Amino acid sequence: MRAVLQRVTRATCTVEGTITGQTGPGLLILLGVAPTDTPEVACALAGKTAKLRIFNDEAGKMNRSVLDIGGGVLSISQFTLYADTRSGNRPSFIAAAPPDRARELYGAFNEALRAQGLEVSEGVFGAHMVLDLTNDGPVTITLDVP
């Protein structure tokens, strides 16, 4: 499972002109699921995400988590995180989990974030989404959990 975490002051997901998810200060998470991922992997990644100290304290040091700042999360499914571009000019996505499995584990990840005490807003799985965000920093972290 692979997550790209972006520290944001705000983020919004729109599908067909309708806002489907948004957050104020917190994290925009792009989540990719691999075929070998499990609910346990989703839970471990959610725990790491919730506790990762990438928000500044009073001294300007990255010493606070999204939980510590009372921030929210906008979670977006993103199979393209498993793109393979080693051969040719067109990416292959065979390293991504099949849609049914990815949907299940995307849901498990979001529920695990909620169990950590986070307010989680979601995109629409499999839809064409338009994301509007304001990066804070910018701070962008990639997490891979085997």
UniProtKB/Swiss-Prot annotation:
TM stretches of this protein: none
Cite the InterPro entries for this sequence.
Answer: Daa-tRNA_deacyls_DTD (IPR003732), DTD-like_sf (IPR023509)
GO molecular function terms here? D-tyrosyl-tRNA(Tyr) deacylase activity; Gly-tRNA(Ala) deacylase activity; Ser(Gly)-tRNA(Ala) hydrolase activity; tRNA binding
EC numbers listed for it are 3.1.1.96
Q: What is the annotated localization of this protein?
A: Cytoplasm
Recorded catalytic activity of this chain's protein = glycyl-tRNA(Ala) + H2O = tRNA(Ala) + glycine + H(+); a D-aminoacyl-tRNA + H2O = a tRNA + a D-alpha-amino acid + H(+)
The reply on keyword tRNA-binding is yes
Q: Which family does it belong to?
A: Belongs to the DTD family.
**Function noted in UniProt:** An aminoacyl-tRNA editing enzyme that deacylates mischarged D-aminoacyl-tRNAs. Also deacylates mischarged glycyl-tRNA(Ala), protecting cells against glycine mischarging by AlaRS. Acts via tRNA-based rather than protein-based catalysis; rejects L-amino acids rather than detecting D-amino acids in the active site. By recycling D-aminoacyl-tRNA to D-amino acids and free tRNA molecules, this enzyme counteracts the toxicity associated with the formation of D-aminoacyl-tRNA entities in vivo and helps enforce protein L-homochirality.
Q: Which HAMAP family match?
A: Deacylase_Dtd (MF_00518)
This protein's domain notes: A Gly-cisPro motif from one monomer fits into the active site of the other monomer to allow specific chiral rejection of L-amino acids.
Task: State the protein's name.
Answer: D-aminoacyl-tRNA deacylase
Gene that encodes it: dtd
